[in-house]
């Protein structure tokens, strides 16, 4: 028996469109992002993938994408679980800043270290910064990070996968995870056993479902597959080029 998992990065957000580091800042989808969410749901339906449960973050761009996709797939009625551990990586002091300007100010090498290295976090966000999450009611009782690298995201995402999400898969449920570029990269790294060095080259496009078929050990039985490979390739290339505009 195989188990079906679908990963979905949220549709384009307002800050994606502005080329800003977003992280834990709670921004809306653009009209394009809404359309991407709808198309994602249509792709699920076209491929006969019927999610039984959805996991998403506490950020509206992922929650909205999940809701739009489920509505388009006529699965709006299934359970939705929201958890902060699926949040995007916290970009620290970079949150709200333009990627191209950061690259120009600090140079390509430092920019790429902060953006794509496995274990180098950006500078921590300062108390009182308008893009800090201190005092946000949704994070009550949580030790809110001040910055994160991808390793930090792996360390919160993978235990949640193992303790919670995996149980639904092994119970025979088709699981949809609607989350963010880095929380999904963390999970893909775990599932496909990608090295710390190679993960830097993995870019996940917005709004295109990525399907896994997993065995009883929750290891892939075949390579991961985007439901729209051509659009995914173009989208991944666009993500890779961020900072260059």
Swiss-Prot record:
First-tier enzyme category under EC: isomerase
GO BP terms: gluconeogenesis; glycolytic process
SMART domains according to UniProt: PGAM
Annotated catalytic residues: 10 (tele-phosphohistidine intermediate), 88 (proton donor/acceptor)
EC id: 5.4.2.11
Reactions catalysed: (2R)-2-phosphoglycerate = (2R)-3-phosphoglycerate
Oxidoreductase listed as a keyword: no
Pathway the protein contributes to: Carbohydrate degradation; glycolysis; pyruvate from D-glyceraldehyde 3-phosphate: step 3/5
GO molecular function list: phosphoglycerate mutase activity
Site (Transition state stabilizer): 180
Record keywords: Gluconeogenesis, Glycolysis, Isomerase
Disulfide bonds listed in the record: none
Record carries keyword Iron: no
Amino acids binding substrate: 9-16, 22-23, 61, 88-91, 99, 115-116, 181-182
Family: Belongs to the phosphoglycerate mutase family. BPG-dependent PGAM subfamily.
Stated role: Catalyzes the interconversion of 2-phosphoglycerate and 3-phosphoglycerate.
Listed name of the protein: 2,3-bisphosphoglycerate-dependent phosphoglycerate mutase
Organism in which the protein naturally occurs: Nocardia farcinica (strain IFM 10152)
Classification lineage: Bacteria, Bacillati, Actinomycetota, Actinomycetes, Mycobacteriales
């Amino acid at each position: 028996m195989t188990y079906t998992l679908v990963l979905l990065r949220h549709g384009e957000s307002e800050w994606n469109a502005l080329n800003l580091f977003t992280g834990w800042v709670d921004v809306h989808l653009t009209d394009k992002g809404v359309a991407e969410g709808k198309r994602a749901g249509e792709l699920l339906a076209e491929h006969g993938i019927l999610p039984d449960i959805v996991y998403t973050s506490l950020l509206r761009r992922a929650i909205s994408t999940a809701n739009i996709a489920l509505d388009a797939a006529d699965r709006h009625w299934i359970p939705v679980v929201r958890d902060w551990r699926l949040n995007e990586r916290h970009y620290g002091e970079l949150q709200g800043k333009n990627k191209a300007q950061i690259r120009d100010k600090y140079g390509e090498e430092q920019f790429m270290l902060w953006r794509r290295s496995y274990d180098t976090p950006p500078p921590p966000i300062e108390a009182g910064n308008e893009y800090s999450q201190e005092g946000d009611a949704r994070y009550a009782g949580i030790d809110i990070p001040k910055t994160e690298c991808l390793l930090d995201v792996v360390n919160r995402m993978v235990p949640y996968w193992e303790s919670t999400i995996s149980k639904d898969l092994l119970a025979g449920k088709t699981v949809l995870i609607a989350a963010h570029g880095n929380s999904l990269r963390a999970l893909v790294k775990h599932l496909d056993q990608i090295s710390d060095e190679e993960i830097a080259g993995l870019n996940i496009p917005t709004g295109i479902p990525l399907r896994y078929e997993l065995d009883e050990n929750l290891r892939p039985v075949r390579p991961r597959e985007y439901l729209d490979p051509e659009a995914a390739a173009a989208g991944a290339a666009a993500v890779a080029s961020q900072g260059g505009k």
